[in-house]
């Protein structure tokens, strides 16, 4: 009986520890941020099974225009989760990556996904289409308002490094 009780106590402690570990990740973010991560997770979880798998990642990259992603790269992403990547694991991975990360660097990193050539610009029309159709969809008026403040090159491409500065520091550069 005592050994049975000790076994039960161990399971309860392990369960509480797992709950504590998973609940901590939710305390790292505000509710609005968690909702945004949930929307991102839903966009990546193409087959809607609650787990991000290699096929989900491949399809997500394909939708972003990156068709030939090496298997090793996809495997490396999945291995970061050290098991199935459900929403809690997804949130934990982002929490670990963003904890101590400069918000400006996080924004630049997101823009770099749409800049495979590394030129520091993204195509205005493609970016507009993404804003109108993906995740937290912008209204056409919101897109036009954003583009009014967005630095562009002569070809009409968005200079995302300057835009990132405006987002993180405000409209005016310090002298």
Curated annotation (Swiss-Prot):
Q: Is Acetylation a UniProt keyword of this protein? A: yes
* One GO term describing the cellular component: A band
Q: Which residues participate in Ca(2+) binding?
A: 45, 47, 49, 56
Q: Which residues carry this modification: Phosphoserine?
A: 22-23
Q: Does the keyword Zinc-finger apply?
A: no
Q: What InterPro entries would the database entry show? A: EF-hand-dom_pair, EF_Hand_1_Ca_BS, EF_hand_dom, Myosin_RLC
N-acetylalanine found at: 2
Where expressed (tissue)?
Predominantly expressed in adult atrial muscle.
Q: Which UniProt keywords apply?
A: Acetylation, Calcium, Metal-binding, Motor protein, Muscle protein, Myosin, Phosphoprotein, Repeat
Extra remark = This chain binds calcium.
Summary of subunit composition and partner proteins: Myosin is a hexamer of 2 heavy chains and 4 light chains.
This one is known as Myosin regulatory light chain 2, atrial isoform
The organism's lineage? Eukaryota, Metazoa, Chordata, Craniata, Vertebrata
Q: Which gene encodes it?
A: MYL7
